[in-house]
Amino acid sequence: MAIEVHGVCPYFEVYDMPNSIRFYRDHLGFEIVSTSPHRGGDKDRFHWCWLRLGTAEIMLNTAYEIDEERPPLENYLRERKHRDTCLYFGCPDVDGAYAELVAKGVVVDRPPTVAPYGMKQMYLHDPDGFGLCFQWKAV
């Protein structure tokens, strides 16, 4: 018997939850599906959230559960350890996604380019340095 699976939902630990929420929700268009209880007055301050864009899902969790434990600056070594992590999103209109992201001020590391294996791909990083690629088979 094969195990029935209906998707995968990667889990990322983030340095600054409100900043990550603004990036994924306001720039990329993800919707918030669920969160842990809100903390303080900021509606984007919580420890954990589940996000969805189309059929793609991700979960974010704060790397520091207690604000006082969070260093004033992002730990470069922590970010460097996941520099090789990249999520690949199926995106039929890579050029349109690129234009929309650039219009919103998002820094794109590599604009849409056709790779030698026939995929049109655009690469960027989220605020914590996790790689994101929007891709589709080139025509």
Language-model regions, residue ranges each:
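Extracellular/periplasmic catalytic domains that process cell-envelope and extracellular macromolecules
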Residues: 52, 80-81
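N-terminal beta-strand motif that seeds the catalytic metal site of vicinal oxygen chelate
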Residues: 1-21, 84-87, 135-139
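Short, P/G- and charge-enriched loop/turn segments at secondary-structure junctions
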Residues: 72-78
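Vicinal oxygen chelate
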Residues: 1-3, 47, 89, 98-139
